[in-house]
C-alpha cells in the first residue's frame, strides 16, 4: 500500500517514485532524528573511551578487569534483551541511556582512579629506571676509564718488562766485564806484588852492598885515624894558656881548612874555648874528639878531591850566621796576607835571609828578608795537598815539605816544580825534616809510622811502626825523636831497630824543637804547656805556663831561640809568648796583628828576627 501522496497511476515514470521515496525518508528523518541526535554521538564517544580504557585495562590485573567486564557484559545483555522485534519508546530509551551513562561514569571513575594510580606507579618506576640508567651510564663511563687505565698500565708493564730485560742483559754484560776485569786486576796486582818484591829485594841488596862499602870505608878511616892518633900520642905536647904557642916560645903554624861538611866557628868562640884552663879529662876527651873530627874531615876532603872528575870544584855550603845573643822581638815590622787560606808552617833558611811558608792552598812561598821587610822571592808549586811542615836542608838549596796527600815532596830552590815525591805513607804526613846531611830525611805520619828516606834514590830505607799518631819529628846526629798523640815522646837510634827511650808528658805532643847543641829538647803539648827536656839526663827540666796561653791545634809549633836562652810559642788568641829558659819565667807576650790562632813560629839563626803565621792567611815579621 502506497503512502500518502503516492501517485495513483502505476505507469508513472520511475523518477516520480524515486522522488516520493526520498521525500518519505526525509520526513522520517525529520521526525525521528531529534530523538537520537544526542545519543549516537555520545555513544560513539563512549565507544572511543571504552577502546582507550580497554587498552589500559589490558595492563591491569584480574579483579578490576573482571568486575568491569562483568558489568559491561550485563549492560550488553540488558541492551540486547530488547529484541529486534521490540520497539522501544523514546522515553524508555532516554531512561536506559541515562542509566547506561551513570554506569559508564562509574566505570570511567574507577578506570580513572586506576589510571591515576598506575600512572603514579609508572612515574615512580620511570624515575627509578632513570636513576638506574644514570648509574648504569656512570658505571659504564667508569668501566671505560678503568679499561683505558688498564690498557695504559698494560703498556707501561710491557715497557718496564722490556726495560728490565734490557737492563738485565746490560747487567749480565757488565758483570761479565767486571769478572774479567777483576781477574785482570788480580793478575796485575800479583805481577805488581812480584815486581815490588823484586824491587825491594834489589834495593835491599843494593843497600846492603852500600852499607858494606860504607862500613869498609869507615873501618879504613878509623884505622887511619887510630894510626894518626897513635903517632900523635907518641909525641909530647904541652898546653899553654896562649893559643897557637908551643913550649919553646915559637907559634904553631895554623892551616885553615874548611871541609864542605864541617860547620864554621867564629874566631872569638874558638879562642875563648882554648883559653879555658885544663881541669879534667873531659876537656882532653873533648879536644881529642874535635881532633878526630878534624882528621876525619881532612881524610874525607882528600878522598872527595881524589875521586872528583876533571878536578871540578867541591860544592861548599854557605856560611851560617852564628847567634851570640838572641834579641827579644818587640814590634811587628811587616804584615802580609801571604796565602789564600790557612798558613800551617814556616821555616828560616840557614843564612837567615830566606824564609819559607806553607799553607792549606798547596803552595810554598819563599821570601827574602831585606831591611825589615818580606819580599817575594819564589813560589813552589806542585804539592798534592795542604802543606803541614817545611824544612831547609843544611845548605839551604832544597826545601822538604810534608803534605796531606800521604807523601812528602822535595823542591830545589830556584825551580818551581817538585823535584821528588816521597810516597809510602797511608795517611796524612804531619812532619818532614832533613837529617844533618842533605841526602837523608825523616817523615812522620798519622798512619802510625816514622820513615827514614835516602833522598839520593828517593827510597825509604827504614820504617818504624808506632802505636800512636806522629805529630812532629826532629833529628840529631844518630837519633830520631818523635812526638805522638798518646802523650809520649819516643827516641829512636838510627843505627838500631828499636825504641831506646820513652818520655811521657801531659797532653798530646804538637811540636818538638832540638837546640843547636843537641842537649835540650823543647816540646809543646795540648795541656797548654811547653816543656824543656835535658837529653843528658833524659828528664823534664822545666815546664812553661802562662795566663792566656792556649795551644790551639795538634800542629801548633814552638821553638828555641838560636842561643837557647828563650822559648817561643803562639797562642789561640793571636798573641806570642816568650819564656826565659834560664829563669823559667815569662819574659814577655806580644800582641800584634794576629786576629786568629797562631799555628807556627820561627826564629832566624842570627837571632834578629821572628816570624809567625796564623789561621787567617797572615805572615808577620817581628823585630
From Swiss-Prot:
WD repeats (start-end): 338-377, 382-421, 424-458, 459-502, 504-543, 550-589, 593-623
Disruption phenotype annotation: ATG16L2-deficient mice are viable and born at Mendelian proportions. Deficient mice exhibit intact canonical autophagy.
Gene3D superfamilies: YVTN repeat-like/Quinoprotein amine dehydrogenase
Primary location group: cytoplasm
Tissue specificity statement from the Swiss-Prot or TrEMBL entry: Widely expressed.
Stretches for region Disordered: 64-93
Cell compartment(s), UniProt: Cytoplasm, Cytosol
Cellular component aspect of the GO annotation: Atg12-Atg5-Atg16 complex; cytosol; nucleoplasm; phagophore assembly site membrane
Keywords associated with the record: Coiled coil, Cytoplasm, Protein transport, Repeat, Transport, WD repeat
This protein's record includes keyword Repeat: yes
Family according to the record: Belongs to the WD repeat ATG16 family.
Note: Although ATG16L2 is structurally similar to ATG16L1 and is likewise able to form a complex with the autophagy proteins ATG5 and ATG12, overexpression and knockdown studies suggest that ATG16L2 is not essential for canonical autophagy.
Protein name from the UniProt record: Protein Atg16l2
Native source organism of the sequence: Mus musculus
Amino acid at each position: 500500500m502506497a503512502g500518502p501522496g503516492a501517485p495513483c497511476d502505476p505507469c508513472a515514470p520511475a523518477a516520480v517514485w524515486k522522488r516520493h521515496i526520498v521525500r518519505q525518508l526525509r520526513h522520517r528523518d525529520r521526525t525521528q532524528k531529534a530523538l537520537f541526535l544526542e545519543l549516537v554521538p555520545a555513544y560513539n564517544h563512549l565507544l572511543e573511551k571504552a577502546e582507550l580504557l580497554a587498552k589500559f585495562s589490558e595492563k591491569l590485573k584480574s579483579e578490576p578487569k573482571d568486575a568491569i567486564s562483568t558489568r559491561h557484559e550485563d549492560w550488553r545483555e540488558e541492551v540486547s534483551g530488547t529484541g529486534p522485534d521490540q520497539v522501544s519508546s523514546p522515553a524508555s530509551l532516554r531512561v536506559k541511556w541515562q542509566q547506561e551513562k551513570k554506569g559508564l561514569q562509574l566505570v570511567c571513575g574507577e578506570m580513572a582512579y586506576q589510571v591515576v594510580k598506575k600512572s603514579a606507579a609508572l612515574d615512580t618506576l620511570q624515575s627509578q629506571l632513570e636513576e638506574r640508567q644514570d648509574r648504569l651510564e656512570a658505571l659504564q663511563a667508569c668501566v671505560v676509564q678503568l679499561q683505558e687505565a688498564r690498557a695504559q698500565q698494560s703498556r707501561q708493564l710491557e715497557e718496564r718488562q722490556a726495560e728490565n730485560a734490557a737492563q738485565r742483559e746490560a747487567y749480565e754484560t757488565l758483570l761479565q766485564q767486571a769478572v774479567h776485569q777483576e781477574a785482570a786486576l788480580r793478575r796485575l796486582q800479583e805481577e805488581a806484588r812480584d815486581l815490588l818484591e823484586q824491587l825491594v829485594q834489589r834495593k835491599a841488596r843494593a843497600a846492603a852492598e852500600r852499607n858494606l862499602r860504607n862500613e869498609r870505608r869507615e873501618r879504613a878511616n878509623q884505622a887511619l885515624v887510630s894510626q894518626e892518633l897513635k903517632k900523635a900520642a907518641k909525641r909530647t905536647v904541652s898546653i899553654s894558656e896562649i893559643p897557637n904557642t908551643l913550649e919553646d916560645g915559637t907559634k904553631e903554624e895554623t892551616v885553615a881548612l874548611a871541609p864542605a861538611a864541617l860547620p864554621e866557628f867564629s874566631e872569638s868562640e874558638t879562642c875563648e874555648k882554648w883559653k879555658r884552663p885544663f881541669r879534667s879529662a873531659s876537656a882532653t876527651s873533648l879536644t881529642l874528639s874535635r881532633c878526630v873530627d878534624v882528621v876525619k874531615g881532612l881524610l874525607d876532603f882528600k878522598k872527595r878531591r881524589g875521586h872528583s872528575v876533571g878536578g871540578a870544584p867541591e860544592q861548599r855550603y854557605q856560611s851560617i850566621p852564628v847567634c851570640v845573643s838572641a834579641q827579644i822581638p818587640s814590634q811587628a815590622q811587616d804584615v802580609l796576607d801571604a796565602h789564600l787560606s790557612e798558613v800551617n808552617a814556616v821555616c828560616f833558611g840557614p843564612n837567615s835571609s830566606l824564609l819559607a811558608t806553607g799553607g792549606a792552598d798547596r803552595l810554598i812561598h819563599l821570601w827574602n828578608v831585606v831591611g825589615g821587610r818580606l819580599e817575594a822571592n819564589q813560589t813552589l808549586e806542585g804539592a798534592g795537598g795542604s802543606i803541614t811542615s817545611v824544612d831547609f836542608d843544611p845548605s839551604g838549596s832544597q826545601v822538604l815539605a810534608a803534605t796531606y796527600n800521604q807523601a812528602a815532596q822535595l823542591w830545589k830552590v830556584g825551580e818551581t816544580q817538585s823535584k821528588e815525591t816521597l810516597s809510602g805513607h797511608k795517611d796524612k804526613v804531619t812532619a818532614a825534616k832533613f837529617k844533618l846531611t842533605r841526602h837523608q830525611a825523616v817523615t812522620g805520619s798519622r798512619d802510625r809510622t816514622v820513615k827514614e828516606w835516602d833522598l839520593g834514590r828517593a827510597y825509604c830505607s827504614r820504617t818504624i811502626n808506632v802505636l800512636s799518631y806522629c805529630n812532629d819529628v826532629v833529628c840529631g846526629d844518630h837519633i830520631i825523636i818523635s812526638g805522638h798523640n798518646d802523650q809520649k815522646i819516643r827516641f829512636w837510634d838510627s843505627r838500631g831497630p828499636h825504641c831506646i827511650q820513652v818520655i811521657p808528658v801531659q797532653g798530646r805532643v804538637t811540636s818538638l824543637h832540638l837546640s843547636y847543641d843537641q842537649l835540650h829538647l823543647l816540646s809543646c803539648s795540648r795541656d797548654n804547656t811547653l816543656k824543656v827536656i835535658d837529653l843528658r839526663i833524659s828528664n823534664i827540666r822545666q815546664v812553661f805556663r802562662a795566663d792566656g796561653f792556649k795551644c790551639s791545634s795538634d800542629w801548633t809549633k814552638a821553638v828555641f831561640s838560636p842561643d837557647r836562652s828563650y822559648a817561643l810559642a803562639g797562642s789561640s788568641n793571636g798573641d806570642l809568648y816568650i819564656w826565659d829558659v834560664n829563669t823559667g819565667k815569662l819574659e814577655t807576650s806580644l800582641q800584634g796583628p794576629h786576629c786568629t790562632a797562631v799555628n807556627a813560629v820561627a826564629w832566624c839563626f842570627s837571632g834578629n828576627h821572628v816570624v809567625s803565621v796564623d789561621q787567617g792567611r797572615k805572615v808577620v815579621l817581628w823585630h
